[in-house]
A protein has these predicted regions:
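N-terminal secretory signal peptides and thylakoid transit peptides that target proteins
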Residues: 1-11
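Hydrophobic h-region of N-terminal signal peptides that target proteins for export
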Residues: 11-17
Length: 224
């Protein structure tokens, strides 16, 4: 087990299965305590454990580094194995709806015009990075992003919102480093859509996470 996975497992064990009370609707953000912020960022309607399927092979963009870490050669520094050879149980991730207002309030994030234009989802955990590597040239990066666009989507009721942009989210005092996926808000999600599903492929793994939209209400509004 890597240090990153151990940290995530430790957080999961400390957090209840689901908040007993929707404190985000009952308390002002300035009154949220550290435990409540952890809940909102790691186990809440806006932050869910991803379902990860390991199938071997490599269909999809893959960097040997984890988000926020320097590129490795062909070996995983913490386990001594390449990412594609790692045990399926080693892959852990949380998908966090980073553009949602309560998440931004918990992170004390600065206002950004991107949150008005995009649904932004953050994949945090012990999974391969899709960030650029130092030995890539511009053409290789562009080709890898095109591949990523083909395998990454946000779905609801049969409609697909395709990937617009991807970038690394740096580590801070509230969150591990992650990968940000940007999807256009041109196709608006509504509570009656019931569910939205994020999915992508990273080398040997499929990553999927389902969100229940009616649970993602904040002060009477669907916040995504």
């Amino acid at each position: 087990m890597t240090r990153r996975t151990a940290l995530m497992v430790g957080v999961a064990r400390l957090l209840p299965a689901y908040p007993a009370k929707e404190f985000w609707n009952d308390k002002n953000p300035s009154d949220w305590n550290a435990e409540e912020i952890d809940l909102l960022l790691n186990k809440s309607p806006w932050a869910k454990d991803a379902s990860i399927s390991y199938y071997g092979g490599q269909n999809g963009p893959l960097s040997n580094s984890l988000p926020g870490e320097r590129s490795r050669s062909s070996r995983n520094a913490s386990s001594g194995t390449s990412p594609s050879a790692a045990s399926p149980a080693a892959w852990k991730a949380i998908i966090r709806w980073q553009s949602a207002l309560p998440v931004r309030l918990a992170l004390k994030a600065e206002p950004s015009p991107d949150t008005e234009k995009f649904y932004i989802l953050n994949m945090v955990g012990d999974v391969p990075s899709v960030g650029a590597t130092p030995d890539e040239d511009a053409a290789q990066r562009a080709a890898r992003f095109e591949t990523l666009k083909q395998v990454t989507k946000l779905e609801h009721k049969g409609d697909e919102i395709l990937l617009s942009r991807v970038e690394v989210a740096p580590k801070n005092n509230l969150s591990l480093a992650g990968t940000l996926f940007y999807f256009s808000r041109g196709l608006a999600l509504r509570p009656e859509d019931k569910q939205a599903t994020f999915s992508t492929k990273l080398g040997p793994i499929d990553v999927k996470c389902k969100f229940t939209l009616r649970d993602m209400m904040y002060r009477g509004n669907l916040e995504l």
